[in-house]
Curated annotation (Swiss-Prot):
One of its GO terms (molecular function) is pantoate-beta-alanine ligase activity. Transmembrane segments: none annotated. It comes from Francisella tularensis subsp. tularensis (strain SCHU S4 / Schu 4). ATP binds at residues 29-36, 147-150, 184-187. GO terms for biological process: pantothenate biosynthetic process. The reaction proceeds by a bi uni uni bi ping pong mechanism. One of its GO terms (cellular component) is cytosol. This is Pantothenate synthetase.
Length: 261
């Protein structure tokens, strides 16, 4: 596996690739888990070259504490990527991605950008779309692999690719879950054993609910010791975000299936 720690190194690697080679790209913020691994394996099966990026993007965090406490396990991540035969790890610094600071940003005007996560985390989608555009311009992949767990993010990136005429196909992969139904997330690494017990109770409640009374469901979730930030039905999906202690988790799933594995 080749590791590029800056854009100049990456461009040299990217330019050396044969034009006919199909390139798959999996953007991450590190702290890799089986959800990321499933994306990488999918990319490996469909491309000649797989690029994974690790960059914790500061502009998509509206809470400084969330940014400061985001899990960092770079050496472990490198071992995971090497074991998966990833071809290139792009691990840029903030200075690489924002050489002149955060001077230009994508400001989404779509309705989906202003509800749920957009409403709860002002500026999040702007920062996310800005860095995704930068990463796509740098990596120039044929295929981009994203997880369904970040559903709003996926919808906005699809619009980004369309509006900026980016010649990249987006492949959306199913959310990977623990046996309890809890979606895999890098932030899960910050959960204590007690927090995990609370999360398991929440997903036991969710698996048994028919989502006909969200107020009653809110009370049930809050009774576990968690703090529900929102739960909402949108089309045929259930979206929710909640805190367990200081850890914020999000999820979405089809109403008919619930949070099934």
């Amino acid at each position: 596996m080749i590791i590029a720690d800056n854009i100049k190194q990456f461009h040299s690697i990217r330019n050396s690739l044969i034009k006919q080679q199909k390139i798959g790209f999996v953007p991450t913020m590190g702290a890799l888990h089986n959800g990321h691994i499933s994306l990488i394996k999918k990319a490996k099966s469909e491309n000649d070259v797989v690029i994974v990026s690790i960059f914790v993007n500061p502009t998509q965090f509206n809470n400084p504490n969330d940014y400061q406490t985001y899990p960092n396990q770079l050496q472990q991540d490198i071992q995971i990527l090497a074991s998966l035969d990833v071809d290139v790890l792009f691990n840029p610094s903030e200075k690489d991605i924002y050489p002149d600071g955060n001077l230009l940003r994508i400001e989404p005007k779509l309705e989906i950008a202003n509800i749920l996560e957009g409403k709860s985390r002002p500026g999040h989608f702007s920062g996310m779309l800005t860095v995704v555009l930068k990463l796509l311009q740098i990596t120039k992949p044929n295929n981009l692999y994203l997880g369904e767990k970040d559903y709003q993010q996926v919808m906005l990136i699809k619009q980004l690719v369309k509006d900026f005429f980016i010649n990249t196909k987006i492949i959306v992969c199913p959310t990977q879950r623990q046996p309890s139904g809890l979606p895999l997330s890098s932030r899960n690494k910050n959960l204590t054993s007690t927090d995990i017990e609370i999360a398991n109770k929440i997903y036991e409640i969710l698996r048994q609910d028919d989502f006909s009374n969200l107020e009653e469901l809110t009370n049930k979730i809050n009774s576990t010791g968690a703090k529900l930030q929102y739960i909402q039905k949108l089309n045929n999906r259930i979206f929710l975000a909640f805190y367990i202690g200081k850890v914020r988790l999000i999820d979405n799933f089809l109403k008919e299936t619930g949070p099934s594995c």
